[in-house]
């Protein structure tokens, strides 16, 4: 494919990077990323992936824009309150970059729908706000051999890890099962600083871009944590592979997708390793 003059100007800051260049930008334009959740994490990830020229971006979310979302979900505006989040997100992404094809899925992602959703995408971003969804995404991606980025946010903290099939532990290797209902506070209960979604969601977009380009080191085998109050990042090395993992281990016991009881959340952290 040949770039138009407008594309050469639009992506010029990418093209001059030796890690990207013309070849890398073509990879981005020919790639596809699915974002599950158009909230605090999915919003900044979607904006940066659209700006980067990722050719096809899917976005799945069943919710509508609420006024309380606007403190952190920067893809939506006051005029969008009451509108389906996927439609609001699509409009914002297409306004940034007309090169991008945005596919919308206004649906709850569950064991019946997720495999069809993820099958045609190169990389998955978990921007969900509850543990049942996070474990479902992990299990589906492991079974479908799809790479994905996990993240969670709460108060002034965030965490991030990346799974690539055959290259490191999955989410269940680290956190075997969802916590009991009400054992971990939600953002609705405990709060979240709005910019935290921007920090962590942007890092998820970066992981997707690096994976597509095949450059740099991904967070495979590591959990990255961030504390905004102390301005500390910690990169925690995880077990390379847990042979007894119930989903990706040598003898998996989870061979079908599970719909756990849903608890209302809006950004979650699990097992912050003593933080």
Regions found by a protein language model. Give the residues of each.
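Adenine nucleotide-associated cytosolic modules
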Residues: 1-275
């Amino acid at each position: 494919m040949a770039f138009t003059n407008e594309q050469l100007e639009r992506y010029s800051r990418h093209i001059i990077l030796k890690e990207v260049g013309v070849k890398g930008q073509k990879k981005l334009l020919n790639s596809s990323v699915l974002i599950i959740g158009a909230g605090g994490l999915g919003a900044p990830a979607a904006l940066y992936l659209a700006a980067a020229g990722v050719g096809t971006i899917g976005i799945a979310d069943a919710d509508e824009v609420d006024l309380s979302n606007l403190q952190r979900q920067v893809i939506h505006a006051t005029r969008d309150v009451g509108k389906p989040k996927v439609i609001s997100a699509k409009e914002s992404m297409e306004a940034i970059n007309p090169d991008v094809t945005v596919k919308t899925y206004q649906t709850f992602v569950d064991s019946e729908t997720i495999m069809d959703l993820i099958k045609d995408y190169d990389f998955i971003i978990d921007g969900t706000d509850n543990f049942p969804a996070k474990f479902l995404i992990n299990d589906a991606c492991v079974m479908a051999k799809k790479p994905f980025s996990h993240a969670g946010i709460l108060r002034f903290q965030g965490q991030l890890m990346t799974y690539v099939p055959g290259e490191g532990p999955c989410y269940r290797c680290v956190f075997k099962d969802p916590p009991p209902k009400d054992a971990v506070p939600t953002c609705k209960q405990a709060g979240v600083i709005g910019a935290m979604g921007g920090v962590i969601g942007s890092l998820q977009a970066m992981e997707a871009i690096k994976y597509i380009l095949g450059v740099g080191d991904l967070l495979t085998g590591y959990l990255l944590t961030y504390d905004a109050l102390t301005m500390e990042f910690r990169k925690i090395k995880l077990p390379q592979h847990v042979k007894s993992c119930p989903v990706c281990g040598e003898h998996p016991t989870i061979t079908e997708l599970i719909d756990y009881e849903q608890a209302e959340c809006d950004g979650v952290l699990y097992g912050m390793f003593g933080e």
